[in-house]
Amino acid sequence: MSRYTGSIFRKSRRLGFSILETGKEFAKGKQRRYAPGLHGLRRSKPSDYGVHLREKQKVRFMYGLSEKQFRNTYRKATKKTGIAGTLFLQALESRLDNSVYRAGFAETRRQARQLVNHGHFLVNNKKVDIPSFQLKQGDIFELTTRKDGKIRKNQQILTSLETRTPAAWLEVDKDNFKVVFNRMPERSELNQEIKESLIVEFYSK
């Protein structure tokens, strides 16, 4: 299954979950927390499989991954010792594109992924254009200075850095467009609407 590139607002409505994590999709006068269409309010009780599938889809769409990417990330993460669900969420959070988003360089994960794809970031002084690149404790990523640092003057990036609050596990130097990945996030610091145990059960069947 390919990565979803359609309307985030519509998908959030269908899932009853804010993919943007801001609730913006359900702001007054915009969208409602039920599926789009004439019969959006009529929801039959989902099966046990349906409940697990919906939870997986919520998180997959939130991070913007294809099914293959999502499943592979889960399998790699859960080979480590620890709580499977937490390890999985930490693996998703430590992706370079997600960290670019969490640091405040972009308003959405889609925008962050595009910045990485276009080669605008260095990790430990080396160009990395792979969104799925896994950051480790102590890694440093920053906006490139190539082409006379043109990307550092991008107004959209500057506005995002100014208005968004970076994640607690990232040390952001806004003046130098540089970020230190200090540590893995604690589960309590991540989205509390996610029931990762259902995803673990889904992939364990």
UniProtKB/Swiss-Prot annotation:
Pfam family, one: Ribosomal_S4
InterPro entries reported in the protein's UniProt record: Ribosomal_uS4, Ribosomal_uS4_bac-type, Ribosomal_uS4_CS, Ribosomal_uS4_N, S4_RNA-bd, S4_RNA-bd_sf
Protein's GO biological process: ribosomal small subunit biogenesis; translation
Keyword set, alphabetical order: Ribonucleoprotein, Ribosomal protein, RNA-binding, rRNA-binding
SUPFAM superfamilies documented for this protein: Alpha-L RNA-binding motif
Gene3D superfamilies the record matches: Ribosomal Protein S4 Delta 41, Chain A, domain 1, RNA-binding S4 domain
GO molecular function, one term: rRNA binding
Record-annotated S4 RNA-binding domain positions: 94-154
A GO-annotated cellular component: small ribosomal subunit
Protein purpose: One of the primary rRNA binding proteins, it binds directly to 16S rRNA where it nucleates assembly of the body of the 30S subunit. With S5 and S12 plays an important role in translational accuracy.
Similarity comment: Belongs to the universal ribosomal protein uS4 family.
The protein's assembly and partners: Part of the 30S ribosomal subunit. Contacts protein S5. The interaction surface between S4 and S5 is involved in control of translational fidelity.
Protein name: Small ribosomal subunit protein uS4
